[in-house]
């Protein structure tokens, strides 16, 4: 059993998993919950960190350098395509990356929760923007390109650059549906449902989601 599955099993013993709930259309960012760490997560974090730093087959020091690696992995789990967060967001939190080890040891996962909450806000803004783009006339006559894998690309420096990326994403989604034989009305209806569903999912997240992602970043970095 590798570290990831060991850690998942440990978390299952100590943590209480939240449940998704039905929500209506989300139209305001204040309808997205601001997630906070729960008591059981602090306990699990302390125990898991202690266990792995003492007994893991791969010896490692949970120092500033290793903390930075965990931070980078967590960041990319949150925004793999580098099309949600801004470069300034990343820079703001990167200043705290050396704190990751101390947070895992103490069980006070402030950085993980703060960054997750910001990514939720940014993701809401992106899908709201995508819904507005859907209202524009569709035009497939240009020679636009869309980079499907932006995992190595820099984060957008400003909102204009971010909007340009999402203009491309929406056009790609539209074209993909057009190639299946859907007309413009069907394309708009399909994507409207898809983007609104993505927004509703944001409102269904809970503290367990943040904790699980933080533990995943930690586990994968030591495997």
Give the residues covered by each predicted segment.
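Flexible, low-complexity junctional segments that flank or bridge functional domains
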Residues: 4, 20-223
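Gram-negative bacterial Sec-dependent N-terminal signal peptides
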Residues: 2-21
């Amino acid at each position: 059993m590798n570290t990831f599955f060991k850690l998942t099993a440990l978390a299952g013993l100590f943590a209480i998993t939240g449940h998704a709930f039905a929500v209506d259309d989300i139209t305001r960012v204040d309808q997205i919950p601001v997630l906070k760490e729960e008591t059981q997560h602090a306990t699990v974090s302390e125990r898991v960190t202690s266990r792995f730093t003492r007994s893991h087959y791969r010896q490692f020091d949970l120092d500033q350098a290793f903390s930075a690696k965990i931070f980078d992995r967590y960041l990319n789990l949150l925004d793999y395509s580098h099309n949600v967060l801004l470069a300034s967001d990343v820079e703001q939190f990167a200043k705290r990356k050396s704190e990751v080890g101390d947070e895992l040891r103490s069980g006070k996962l402030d950085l993980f929760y703060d960054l997750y909450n910001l990514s939720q806000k940014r993701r809401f803004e992106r899908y709201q923007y995508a819904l507005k783009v859907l209202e524009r006339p569709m035009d497939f006559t240009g020679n636009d390109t869309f980079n499907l894998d932006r995992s190595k690309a820099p984060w957008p420096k400003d909102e204009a650059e971010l909007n340009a990326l999402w203009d491309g994403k929406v056009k790609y989604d539209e074209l993909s549906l057009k190639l299946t034989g859907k007309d413009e009305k069907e394309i708009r209806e399909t994507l409207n449902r898809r983007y609104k569903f993505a927004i509703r999912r944001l409102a269904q997240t809970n503290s367990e989601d943040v904790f699980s992602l933080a533990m995943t970043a930690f586990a994968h970095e030591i495997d």
